[in-house]
Amino acid sequence: MTSWPPRIVIRRSSGLRTMESALVRSGLGPVAGVDEAGRGACAGPLVVAACVLAPKPYPALARLDDSKKLTERTREELFPAITRLAVAWSVVSFPADEVDRMGVHVANIEGMRRAVAGLTTTPGYVLTDGFRVPGLPAPSLPVIGGDAAAACIAAASVLAKVSRDRVMVAMDETHPGYGFAIHKGYNTPAHLAALEVLGPCPEHRRSWSNVAALLHRVDNSSGSAR
């Protein structure tokens, strides 16, 4: 019995475009890639992006790779090139309180659905970065390390990362002292030290253990003082 999609599709390839090309040759295009940014942060939004690239070389995207391997400058330079050259792209965001209400995994999966639904081109196949996503409008495949294995996922990774980083830089102006523009809401020593001094702001995720523990200590201290 022949597996479907073809086995070549699910192997991690040496070239970023091999996965998309194999799917398109099998009649399953256009192919959308989906990825997120901010899943592990204790502050700021969860941002999810979807992107469809045509199965052809893009000289302007020659540096495209897993966004975590790229410098901030390179990501910023790639962002307008991706939005200009992509067949379709979409970015959705969940603020901290919504991540708390839904749970980060549920928000991530729902974000992937919404990002794909927001594409102006309906994909024939969807590649997600590591997560199985039920309820998509097309067949899909989770790819471990997908942002390093498929160009459309790498492009979505850059879109999500740059979009979120820009929000965090603006948030640094609204909530000074935490260093959001530097650490982007992740649990760095500097961020944790600022949290101890300033306490959580409205952009911190109350469901995160370190934020919840700090709030618990503050509540106990307030209770003891009364």
From Swiss-Prot:
Question: Where does this polypeptide localize?
Answer: Cytoplasm
Q: Which domain of life is it from?
A: Bacteria
Which residues take part in binding a divalent metal cation?
35-36, 129
The biological process GO terms on file are: DNA replication, removal of RNA primer; mismatch repair
> Which InterPro entries does this UniProt record tie to the protein?
RNase_HII, RNase_HII/HIII, RNase_HII/HIII_dom, RNaseH-like_sf, RNaseH_sf
CC annotations in GO: cytoplasm; ribonuclease H2 complex
From the UniProt record, list the reaction(s) this protein catalyses.
Answer: Endonucleolytic cleavage to 5'-phosphomonoester
List its EC numbers.
3.1.26.4
Domain RNase H type-2 positions: 29-220
Q: Does the keyword Ribonucleoprotein apply?
A: no
Name the cofactor(s) required for activity, per the record. Mn(2+); Mg(2+)
What keywords appear on the UniProt entry?
A: Cytoplasm, Endonuclease, Hydrolase, Manganese, Metal-binding, Nuclease
Membrane-spanning residues: none
A GO term for molecular function: RNA-DNA hybrid ribonuclease activity
Q: Which Gene3D superfamilies match?
A: Ribonuclease H-like superfamily/Ribonuclease H (3.30.420.10)
- Return the cofactor note field: Manganese or magnesium. Binds 1 divalent metal ion per monomer in the absence of substrate. May bind a second metal ion after substrate binding.
State the protein's purpose. Answer: Endonuclease that specifically degrades the RNA of RNA-DNA hybrids.
Q: Which HAMAP family match?
A: RNase_HII_B (MF_00052_B)
Which family is annotated? Belongs to the RNase HII family.
- Spell out the protein name for this chain: Ribonuclease HII
